UniProtKB/Swiss-Prot annotation:
Part of the 50S ribosomal subunit. Belongs to the universal ribosomal protein uL4 family. Residues 44-76 are annotated as: Disordered. GO terms for biological process: translation. Signal peptide: none annotated. This is Large ribosomal subunit protein uL4. One of its GO terms (cellular component) is ribonucleoprotein complex. It comes from Clostridium perfringens (strain 13 / Type A). InterPro entries: Ribosomal_uL4, Ribosomal_uL4-like, Ribosomal_uL4_dom_sf. Pfam families: Ribosomal_L4 (PF00573). Keywords: Ribonucleoprotein, Ribosomal protein, RNA-binding, rRNA-binding. One of the primary rRNA binding proteins, this protein initially binds near the 5'-end of the 23S rRNA. It is important during the early stages of 50S assembly. It makes multiple contacts with different domains of the 23S rRNA in the assembled 50S subunit and ribosome. GO terms for molecular function: rRNA binding; structural constituent of ribosome.
Length: 204
């Protein structure tokens, strides 16, 4: 079983914690990670981009000049794509980019992402602030020399969220909002002991 240090928010190690091998010690499946990240980013897309083709632009129904005899290039419509204010060739239309991923693949990707972050994981005994204080959050992050950090709490914690939301490169989320992309995108994974237990309950 993987074992990592257990720390307080001052950066002092207060013990160790055994991690569940079925969640934090699996073989990393790069294919599943790729599929889930691609789907996650695709699902964020609005898909509302739209432009008009030559048939949809107003006007242009009449031939601008006769076919032959003018010395100019032949033209059929002032709304052809080569004209100013003409239609767009292969104009983009609203579409749905959503991708669905099987539940089993999502689980494999999540456990793979968690396993890949064990070396960069800081497990906190507890994480609470009496009031929203960015200074306190910065002090804690500096104690661990954390860069581009994802902080995962067991529940929604307003004081922790408000303390860290103005710090560049820091994301705070409750354990039920964790996702593969954010896990892979962080340099340091800071997670409370209670959040670890909840993850193991779901994915073990």
């Amino acid at each position: 079983m993987p074992k990592v240090g257990l720390f307080n928010k001052e950066g002092q190690q207060v013990g160790d914690i055994q991690l569940n091998e079925q969640v934090f010690g699996v073989e990393v499946n790069k294919y599943a990670l790729h599929q889930v990240v691609v789907a996650q980013l695709a699902n964020k897309r609005q898909g509302t981009q739209s432009a008009k083709t030559r048939s949809e632009v107003r006007g242009g129904g009449i031939k601008p000049w006769r076919q032959k005899g003018t010395g100019r290039a032949r033209q059929g419509s002032i709304r052809a794509p080569q004209w100013i204010k003409g239609g767009v060739v292969f104009a983009p239309k609203p579409r749905d980019y959503r991708m669905s991923i099987p539940k089993s693949m999502r689980k494999v990707a999540m456990t793979s992402a968690l396993t890949s972050k064990v070396a960069d994981m800081v497990v906190l005994e507890d994480l609470t602030f009496e009031a929203p204080k960015t200074k306190e959050a910065v002090k804690m992050l500096n104690a661990f020399e954390a860069k581009k950090t994802l902080i995962i709490t067991a529940e929604v914690n307003e004081n922790v969220y408000k303390s860290a939301r103005n710090i560049r490169g820091v994301t705070v989320m409750p354990v039920n909002n964790i996702n593969v992309y954010d896990l892979l995108n962080c340099k340091t994974l800071m997670i409370t002991k209670e959040a670890v237990n909840k993850i193991e309950e779901v994915y073990a």
